[in-house]
Amino acid sequence: MKNLFIGVDFSKEKVDVAIIFADGLTETAARVFNEFKTTVSGYKQLVKWVEQNSCGIDSSLWLFCGENTGDYSKGLCNFLYGKGYDMWLENAKSIKDASGLRRLKSDRADASMIAEYAMRNYDKAIMYEPLSESLAQLRELFLYRQMVVRHRCSFQVRRGEKRLTMEKSPIKTMISQSGRHIVSELNKEVEKIDKRIAELIKSDEELTEVFTIVTSVPGIGTQNAVCLMVYTDNFRRFNYDSRKIACYYGIAPFGNDSGTSVHSDPRVHYMANRQIKAMLTQAALAAVNFNPVMARYYMRLVERGKKKQVALNNVKNKLVHLVTAMVRNRQTFTPEYKISA
């Protein structure tokens, strides 16, 4: 049981902090507030301030909590983890939805709301653990590659539009040549990133093992494998639970029933990481074409009357369940794997 809950509201240049003293769900003292810079010295001042205002409560009974804001939250979380403090990094929407109607919006109020959320939902807390150094580097490379590919696609589309809409002129020629050069350079950059990703995976024994297992499934290529590894912390983030991974990917169907008048067939929810969901769609399409096991499964569903998009989503689910089980059991794919309908 924790008795000191520290809510942290992250921003680019500072963090706002609120402390709640509690015995169970009962607050035992007035809340205290402060703000600190997002620097190592600022983090040290934060911890020192909490110690001074902890009323003698041992640090093992503290719980820091904040919204997952990506890079903004990473610095303090890694600092607290390195010092041995418990840090809970929660989804921002979960905190907002659980906090009810709020009229006041300020950094201080947000920090207070986060601290209260931590107090009331302590039993759901998942303590923060940073990615391994190799996996963190792999994540940065993967995200950088995604950005470069988006820019390349943007220039390719732009060049195509100009080719169709502009009359021949020196300006059109200049734009076309410049665009061609930029696309060529971006292609070289993608190749460089792919080479670095391969070197990084090869240099780490665990990454090599998991990557080999995942890519042994026909239809799952390098980028889908890296995507799975990065977003699931080598499948440990969800404790090898394929249902949770499918939910995170946005491919798990959910029903909508209420009383006697509201009823709809289960369907996937809009809340998902759409970028990685699109990548899994590509993997499913490749699996249907090149993986005999998945192809037979897909055709059985279509023959039963399933719509093709529904059948394809089922293939995505099967891929996630299959890959998760293979990584958990440390086994590579063989055609003898049985996929139940």
Residue ranges and their predicted role:
Residues 24-63:
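Nucleic-acid-processing active sites and adjacent nucleic-acid-binding tracks
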Residues 54, 127-140, 167, 264-267, ...:
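Short, solvent-exposed helix-loop connector elements
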Residues 62-75:
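Acidic, metal-coordinating catalytic cores used for nucleic-acid/nucleotide bond scission
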Residues 81:
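Anion (oxyanion) recognition and catalysis
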Residues 260-261, 297-341:
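Low-complexity, acidic/Ser/Thr- and charged residue-rich accessory regions of DNA metabolism proteins
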